[in-house]
Amino acid sequence: MRAATLYRYSIPMEAGVILRHQRLKSRDGLLVKLQQGEQTGWGEIAPLPEFSQETLPEAQAAAIAELQRWVNGEELDLGPLPSVAFGLSCALAELEKLLPLSADYHKAPLCTGDPDELFAVLQALPGEKVAKVKVGLYEAVRDGMIVNVLLEALPDLKLRLDANRSWTRAKADGFAKYVNPELRSRIAFLEEPCKTRAESREFARDTGIAIAWDESVREADFQVEAEPGVAAIVIKPTLVGSIARCQQLVQQAHQAGLEAVISSSIESSLGLTQLARLADWLTPATVPGLDTLSLMQAQCIRQWPDSTLPVVTVDQLDVLWHS
């Protein structure tokens, strides 16, 4: 006997969370629960505004159609919408006990640029000292100076930087000019510095700063391949698709000698804990990029270890559909 329920959550965000062009006041998404006999599986479907190709209403309609088919005994067709494919594949993997329970709760902390604050966070971290800095929100020169200060102050630090394609080539060069060439090798990678792949490749070649593909991974013409100056691909499952698609990308990256980094799209704590399990399974040697829970004012159903945020329980969620 199969049963399914679709819930909706809305979690207030901390003030000042800005996506590309808009402030995110709340994180809204769907949670799916599949039940078959004694087994239960959960998944999260949460398109990210400005980044996902689908809207939440589109994801909701597609999810309900799929759940209806599944309850009627058909196989789940994960469909073309990445957030729906990822959420349903997680629920199915939990139901069938295919998603391992062990998780990698290490995370590359998101850093605002204060070396003292970052030093305190990193001192408490076991293993590799990796942090992430968002660049491209302010002046490129300011970003370069902050990165240089962090690398100088913390000699065992490696930085991941994310520019979200926000720079012209001239601005990217302005950033690089303020990062001491001797420190650049400790930039693990800079995600998509320029507006085009060609400009980003040229930037890596001319500055010696390694880059990673992020937005490109979701584009139809993208091929995972080894190329000079490219160190990694960033996999955001909510934006990429099913667990199987994520596995495929990880395998292709490793075959090409690239690092694959599982990364958050600001999912709730339920989705984040699943990403931690996915990272431990598929990319055990790489610290995942999951430090987004602090952007929220609450957790949802499942707790992230050590988080003191209040937890929204299943009884507090709106039921959108139930079989």
Curated annotation (Swiss-Prot):
It comes from the Bacteria. It is an enzyme of class 4 (lyase). Converts 2-succinyl-6-hydroxy-2,4-cyclohexadiene-1-carboxylate (SHCHC) to 2-succinylbenzoate (OSB). The gene is menC. Belongs to the mandelate racemase/muconate lactonizing enzyme family. MenC type 1 subfamily. Mg(2+) binds at residues 162, 191, 214. The active site is at residues 134, 236. HAMAP family: MenC_1. This is o-succinylbenzoate synthase. Its cofactor is a divalent metal cation. It catalyses: (1R,6R)-6-hydroxy-2-succinyl-cyclohexa-2,4-diene-1-carboxylate = 2-succinylbenzoate + H2O. Its EC number is 4.2.1.113. Coiled coil: none annotated. One of its GO terms (molecular function) is O-succinylbenzoate synthase activity. InterPro entries: Enolase-like_C_sf, Enolase-like_N, Enolase_C-like, Mandelate_racemase_C, OSB_synthase_MenC1, OSBS_N. Pathway: Quinol/quinone metabolism; 1,4-dihydroxy-2-naphthoate biosynthesis; 1,4-dihydroxy-2-naphthoate from chorismate: step 4/7; Quinol/quinone metabolism; menaquinone biosynthesis. It comes from Yersinia enterocolitica serotype O:8 / biotype 1B (strain NCTC 13174 / 8081). The lineage of its organism: Bacteria, Pseudomonadati, Pseudomonadota, Gammaproteobacteria, Enterobacterales. One of its GO terms (biological process) is menaquinone biosynthetic process. Keywords: Lyase, Magnesium, Menaquinone biosynthesis, Metal-binding.
